[in-house]
Every structure is written in structure tokens, then in C-alpha cells.
Amino acid sequence: MTESTSRRPAYARLLDRAVHILAVRDHSEQELRRKLAAPIMGKNGPEEIDATAEDYERVIAWCHEHGYLDDSRFVARFIASRSRKGYGPARIRQELNQKGISREATEKAMRECDIDWCALARDQATRKYGEPLPTVFSEKVKIQRFLLYRGYLMEDIQDIWRNFAD
């Protein structure tokens, strides 16, 4: 730690760090708390910030007040991002749960997003296995396993073959 940063109050250093973290991408409140609590890598190795629990709470409150931290915005952007990468609703729900987002907030955002999961599942299957999709049972099982791993629901996967004539 340099002499100038060691004289700055812990709250100011935490606030700077929070703004830098949130400037890169949106984070959930739990993610931000975890990153703020982690030691900072300095020239001489990891450095701890001597901050109190009150300092952390003040920083989190400041970030909420000034719009830097918003879990509902984070959830909406996360769902959009992960669905563009080809992940299904089950996987997205699990990842949001790991990031500390409540089940209610996740379900609300999933209802509000306008994503056709069946069409996305079909796109992922055709991207990986080609068009037309195989109708042989053993190949269907491979596709089903792949899509389940990606987080798609069984009903969406079954709709791919149900709507095969489309």
C-alpha cells in the first residue's frame, strides 16, 4: 500500500473499489460484497482494507442510491446475456441463485423476459447437429442430453420434435 492510499479512510477506498468493479459490468449485491471483502493485490502481495461492517453497508447503500447497484437490472441483463449464449432457463436460474438473487426476483424477471425457449433450444440443436435434426432415437438422445446440460426444460426439448413438421 502506498503512503497516500494508506492515509485515505477505508470507506473512501471501498467506495472507489466498488465503483471500479461496477464500471466493468453489473454485479449482484452478493457478488459486490464478496469482491469488496477480498484482499486487494498490491505490489507487495495481498493487502487487506481495514474497513468495518458499517463501512461496507454504507458503500452498498451509496451504490444503490446512485444507481450503480440494481439487482433487478442485473437479473434482466444476465438473462439476456446468457440466453444469447445459448443457455436455457434452468441453467440461468441456477446461476442466478449462485449469485445470490432470490427465487422471486428470478421468476419475476423470467416471466418479464420475452424469450422463446423452444426456439432457442431448436437453434442450439441445429447449430450443433445440423439441419434437419436427426430422427433416429440414439441421435435424439444425444441432442436431448446436450440441451438438458445447456439448461433447457424437457418440455421445450420435446417440442422440437413435436413441431418437426413446421
From Swiss-Prot:
Native source species: Shigella boydii serotype 18 (strain CDC 3083-94 / BS512)
UniProt entry tagged with the keyword Transit peptide: no
Coiled coil ranges: none
Superkingdom to which the source organism belongs: Bacteria
The keyword Cytoplasm is assigned to this record: yes
Major place of residence: cytoplasm
Lineage: Bacteria, Pseudomonadati, Pseudomonadota, Gammaproteobacteria, Enterobacterales
Gene Ontology terms: biological process: regulation of DNA repair
Protein name: Regulatory protein RecX
Function, in words: Modulates RecA activity.
A GO-annotated cellular component: cytoplasm
Keywords: Cytoplasm
Family of this protein: Belongs to the RecX family.
Protein location: Cytoplasm
